[in-house]
Regions:
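Nucleotide/pyrophosphate-binding catalytic subdomain
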Residues: 1-156
Length: 160
């Protein structure tokens, strides 16, 4: 079994994500593969900036948020060619974005952004991109890392 980890640049553009697909599918011909992906390039920073805008009571958080939604939608529209898979993925991704919008709105309303809340916000980057990649790659299945990673301390760098 091989674990392949791809950073944000590897999932940052249509060209790079299609290259990732080729690499994974080639490796999977000879052995089982686990794929770990970062958020789309630049999304982690945008998630944090949007959280800080919401914390400051700046309505601009909504524009930043919509830009993230648009970026993910464009990626999906471009790389997922099967209509049914694309529709299912849009439903999944849009559900996640609705959760994220609610979190941002809560931060905006109460002017509080705990470390735990920021960690939850940032986690959406990887969760969104991993759903996209799992849909793109032939015979792939998506697993939610939260189901099997145990965190002993609740800090931004404490996953074990």
């Amino acid at each position: 079994m091989k674990v392949l980890k791809f950073g944000g640049t590897s999932v940052g553009s249509v060209k790079s994500i299609l290259s990732l697909k080729r690499i994974v599918e080639k490796e999977a011909e000879s052995q089982p593969v686990i794929v770990v992906v970062s958020a789309l390039g630049g999304i982690t920073d945008k998630l944090i900036v949007t959280a800080r805008l919401a914390l400051q009571g700046d309505e601009g958080w909504r524009n930043e948020f919509e830009a993230m939604v648009d970026r993910h939608h464009k990626m999906i529209d471009t790389i997922i060619t099967d209509t049914k898979k694309r529709e299912d993925l849009f439903n999944t991704v849009d559900g996640m974005f609705e959760q994220l919008r609610s979190i941002y709105y809560g931060v905006f309303l109460i002017h509080d952004l705990s470390e735990k809340t920021l960690d939850a916000i940032v986690s959406y980057g990887e969760r969104l991109s991993s759903n996209i990649v799992a849909t793109l790659i032939s015979k792939a299945r998506w697993f939610d890392a939260r189901d099997f990673i145990i965190c002993l301390l609740y800090t931004s760098d404490a996953a074990d």
